[in-house]
Structures are given as C-alpha cells and as structure tokens.
C-alpha cells in the first residue's frame, strides 16, 4: 500500500546488507506482492514469510469506549495474519470480502482526492491531482492518503521552479500557514502535507466509512482461510510510557485475547523500550502465545530493517533476540505445514543457515 522503499528489491537488498535473513512482507488488505517477494528472497538466499494486515472493528469494545491498539478510536483494532499460504489459496466468499474492503478503502482515498482538488482550485494552486495517475504511477493497486501527500509534493515541485516559489505555494495551499519542514526533506514535507490537509480538521479530510472495517471475527476467518495465523499487534508503551485501555492490564488483555481465539501476538520493536518488551513478551510466551517482532516502514522515512528498540539503537537484547527467533520458527513451521517450533528451527537452520 505505502512504504519508504522504492521497490521490493531495495527492501531485500537492505535486509541482506544488514544480515537479516528471515524477512516477512506485510501489506494492508493485499497479497499482491507475494510472488515478487518469494522470487526476490530466493535470489538473495533469504527466507520469505507472507503476512497481511487489516483494520477491524470490535463492537463490544467500541460500545464500552475501550481503546485497543488504535489510541484514537475506541473499538478499532489492527489485526495481522502471519504465515499465510503461498501460492495464495484464498478464494470464494472470504476472497470477495477482502476485495470489497480493499475497494472501499481505495474509494475513501478517491473521495479525499476530489476534496483536495476542490481545495487546490479554491486557493488557485494552478494544478490538480489526477487520482487515476496516482494509482498507476505510485501504487500497486492499494492507494492510501500518503500517496496523495506524495503526489501533492511532487506536483508542487513541478509547478514551482525554486525553493522560494515552493515555500510560497505551500503557504497558499496551507491557508496562510508556512511550511515548517525543510523544503529539501521530502519525507518531512509529505508528513506535513498529510497532517495539515488530509487528517482530521484538514481541508481534504474525509472520514472513513464504517464499511471499510470488518468485524474482528470476520477478519480472523479471512486470515485462516488464507492459511495464516490471526495475530494481535500490541502497541505497548508509547513515547510517554502510556498504554491503551486494553493493553495496560497485561493479564486481562491476555485473557481476553485467548477468549477471542488469538494464539499469536506481535510487536513493532522501535515503538517500545527494552524493559517493557521483555516484560510483555516474557508474560505472553508463558501464557502460550507465539510472539513475533517486526520493523515499521509505512512512512516516507527510510528506516533500517534490522530490529532495535526505542531506547537501544544498536539492536535487541539477547533475551529479545531469542524471543524473536523462536517466533520466527513458529511462523515458519506453520507456513510450511509443520507442527512445532523445533520443526521450524530445523527448517530455518537447514534453509537459511545451511546447518
């Protein structure tokens, strides 16, 4: 849908250069990248994993005003699928539900583009954004608001010949507010465009339609039909040390996840401190959950692939490295139709490490 990478090859070249040998693709509502991921991993002797991500809605949590893993929207819950089958096996009713939710997600961004063009016309920007061209040039079929931000930044670059002219044009587009980002920092400029125009309160903001969010149970069913493991992504501690309503009581969160049928959880390690990650992952492993880690690349900023924590740029602690590998073994085993972490370890040792 959107990433900092120019293409799959760049992402995997970075992984190989950083000595990351087990690599997973993860995209919103899409498995379209699986073939290229598989083939390019093979060319670099990397082990591919196949994942997917959804935004779901839990009506019970929404009614209770409970923030789960979206800190701003009670009941809205991000879910991942780990170790999906490749070649893709999803078909029938579940495949149609996935196609429908992806189409609605794209339609919401198309409505946003129309509103953005109305704003550009009102401020006499001198150009507009061609939605079909954005989809063709900047996406593989899944379009997000970040693509609109990138398209607008590129349009301003094309319309204004020098830095001073671009700054003046941004000030007009932003309703008299000057651009705060350095004009040469494309990633920062795109983030500012998104924040000022496309998010809530912005001139081109369009709220997401409830149709874009499937019930949690339906998402889990789609993931299982695709051969994957339904997985709950923990936010855990934010930069101020705060937790969401759902995650603050770890024991209660684990019990609720079990009742809802989850056996797998994941963390994006750069979001959290080492101490919190170790505490949460130790507890969740003891409770029988598969625990996996991942990196985050859904902004314009190009970040390393090798895992690290918020308070340790050098990498993971030895305890977290072992947790990470154990989780990778569990997912690799599932993906290969094997039945244990040990079998996954043997598979990875043989195929990745040549042991």
What is each PLM-predicted segment?
Residues 93, 147, 151, 165-169, ...:
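Exposed alpha-helical structural elements
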Residues 1-76, 192-226, 232-302, 311, ...:
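An N-terminally biased module of ancient metal coordination in phosphate/nucleic-acid-related enzymes
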Residues 36-42, 143-155, 176-190, 210-220:
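Short, charge-rich amphipathic segments
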Residues 65-95:
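A basic- and aromatic-enriched beta-loop-alpha substructure that forms the phosphate/nucleotide-
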């Amino acid at each position: 849908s959107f990433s900092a990478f120019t293409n799959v090859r760049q992402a995997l070249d970075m992984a190989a250069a950083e000595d990351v040998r087990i690599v997973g693709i993860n995209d919103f509502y899409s498995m379209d990248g699986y073939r290229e991921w598989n083939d390019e991993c093979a060319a670099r002797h990397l082990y591919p994993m196949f994942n997917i991500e959804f935004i779901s809605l839990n009506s019970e949590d929404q009614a209770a005003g409970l923030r789960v893993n979206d800190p701003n929207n009670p009941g809205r819950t991000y879910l991942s699928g780990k170790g999906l089958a490749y070649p893709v096996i999803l078909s029938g009713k579940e495949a149609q539900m996935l196609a429908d939710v992806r189409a609605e997600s794209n339609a919401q961004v198309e409505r946003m583009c129309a509103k953005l063009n109305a704003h550009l016309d009102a401020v006499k920007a001198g150009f507009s954004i061609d939605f079909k061209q954005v989809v063709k040039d900047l996406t593989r079929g899944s379009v997000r608001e970040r693509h609109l931000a990138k398209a607008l930044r590129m349009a301003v670059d094309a319309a204004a010949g020098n830095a001073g002219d671009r700054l003046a044009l941004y000030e007009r587009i932003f309703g008299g507010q000057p651009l705060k980002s350095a004009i040469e920092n494309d990633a920062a400029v795109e983030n500012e465009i998104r924040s000022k125009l496309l998010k809530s309160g912005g001139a081109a903001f369009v709220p997401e339609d409830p149709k874009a969010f499937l019930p949690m149970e339906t998402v889990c069913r789609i993931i299982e039909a695709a051969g994957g493991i339904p997985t709950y992504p923990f936010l855990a501690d934010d930069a101020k040390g705060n937790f969401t309503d759902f995650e603050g009581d770890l024991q209660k969160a684990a019990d609720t996840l079990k009742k809802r049928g989850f056996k797998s959880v994941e963390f994006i390690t750069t979001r959290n401190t080492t101490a919190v990650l170790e505490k949460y992952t130790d507890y969740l492993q003891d409770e029988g959950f598969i625990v996996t880690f991942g990196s985050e690349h859904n902004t314009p900023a190009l970040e390393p692939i090798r895992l690290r924590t918020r308070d340790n740029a050098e990498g993971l602690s030895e305890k977290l490295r072992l947790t990470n590998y154990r989780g990778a073994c569990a997912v690799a085993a599932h993906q290969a139709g094997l039945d244990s972490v040990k079998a996954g370890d043997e598979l990875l040792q043989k195929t990745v490490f040549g042991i």
